[in-house]
């Protein structure tokens, strides 16, 4: 039986101990994807689409290359395993050994090179891929987020949500917001694409959540044009992109989306609390969106409206495998998180 590169994930109503008696929040659990995050959707779609094209052209199977030592690299590795493709992932020296092992366990060849992602990426594209091309193989470079085909894959999350709401007899006008974390804008762009396809982009506001130190979208919005961050300082390393995808920036302004920036302390506290409440370990990038479940006043403030008992808010729990519970405890101690 052929494996699929992503799974339909549950949309679960969760009641949070936030001082209010409500059942607003429906959480989409992308942590249950084969690669542990939403990235399985888009990156898997990119790889599958290009592999099908290569086979139809008679070029043989693809050789796939990724330069992410995080969730994108793991998504590429798991997608390639499902299609029996060779996958090479170049990671910088800063990559945690447990992530290297995870990517290797998914069947990818891992090369450690460079002091940061930029050096790993350059080595991958200019050295490794060039060598493979000389051998006559058709190669595919997998960017972590900035690719329209990747967004197309991520957009399936919206189709699923609409289907699942219908199954639960929940009408779309009850949905007052869709909340997602933003790094480089891949997930956000996919959500916008999905909302556009379903004629909902102007009806359901998207709340984009970032952490201070990785808040490239918020800083770009304040400047009025995309900026590049020279330094990334947040504990939410999976949100650590130096730039925001152009489509994400343009769509934010076009559809009147909302921006929230949280502190590392707030996000770490939420991750620990969520683990205690639900026995799910989510990394800070995911905890950023879940933070609004524990603090609905932030949501009401940014939406400039009261959210009532019959209203629904969709939270994308984007997943991620970059931190363990021990990592949270250590980081929380360093940042004096109570």
From Swiss-Prot:
Its main location: cytoplasm. Pathway: Carbohydrate biosynthesis; gluconeogenesis. One of its GO terms (molecular function) is L-serine ammonia-lyase activity. One of its GO terms (cellular component) is cytoplasm. Keywords: Cytoplasm, Gluconeogenesis, Lyase, Pyridoxal phosphate. It holds the Pfam family PALP. Its EC number is 4.3.1.17. GO terms for biological process: gluconeogenesis; isoleucine biosynthetic process; L-serine catabolic process; threonine catabolic process. It catalyses: L-serine = pyruvate + NH4(+). It is found in: Cytoplasm. PROSITE patterns: DEHYDRATASE_SER_THR. Its cofactor is pyridoxal 5'-phosphate. Belongs to the serine/threonine dehydratase family. This is L-serine dehydratase. The gene is SDL1.
């Amino acid at each position: 039986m052929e494996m699929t590169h992503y799974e339909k994930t549950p949309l679960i109503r969760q009641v949070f101990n936030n001082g209010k008696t409500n059942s607003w929040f429906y959480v989409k659990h992308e942590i249950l994807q084969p690669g542990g995050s939403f990235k399985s959707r888009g990156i898997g779609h990119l790889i599958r689409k290009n592999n099908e094209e290569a086979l139809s052209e008679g070029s043989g199977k693809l050789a796939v290359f990724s330069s992410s030592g995080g969730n994108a690299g793991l998504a590429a590795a798991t997608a390639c395993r499902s299609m029996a493709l060779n996958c090479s992932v170049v990671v910088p020296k800063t990559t945690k050994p447990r992530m290297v092992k995870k990517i290797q366990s998914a069947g990818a060849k891992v090369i450690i090179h460079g002091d940061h992602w930029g050096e790993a990426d350059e080595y991958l594209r200019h050295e490794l891929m060039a060598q493979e091309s000389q051998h006559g193989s058709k190669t595919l470079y997998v960017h972590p987020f900035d690719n329209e085909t990747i967004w197309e894959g991520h957009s399936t999350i919206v189709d699923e949500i609409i289907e699942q709401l219908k199954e639960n007899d929940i009408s779309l006008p009850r949905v007052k917001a869709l909340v997602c974390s933003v790094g480089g804008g891949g997930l956000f762009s996919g959500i916008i694409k999905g909302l556009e396809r379903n004629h909902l982009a102007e009806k359901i506001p998207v709340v984009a959540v970032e952490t201070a130190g990785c808040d490239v979208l918020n800083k770009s919005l304040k400047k009025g044009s995309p900026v590049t961050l020279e330094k990334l300082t947040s504990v939410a390393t999976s949100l650590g992109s130096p730039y925001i995808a152009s489509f994400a920036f343009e769509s934010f302004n076009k559809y009147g989306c909302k921006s929230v920036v949280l502190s590392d302390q707030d996000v770490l506290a939420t991750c620990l609390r969520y683990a205690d409440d639900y026995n799910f370990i989510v990394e800070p990038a995911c905890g950023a969106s879940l933070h609004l479940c524990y603090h609905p006043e932030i949501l009401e403030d940014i939406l400039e409206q009261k959210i009532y008992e019959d209203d629904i808010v969709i939270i994308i729990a984007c997943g991620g495998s970059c931190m363990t519970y021990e990592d949270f405890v250590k980081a929380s101690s360093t940042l004096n998180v109570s």
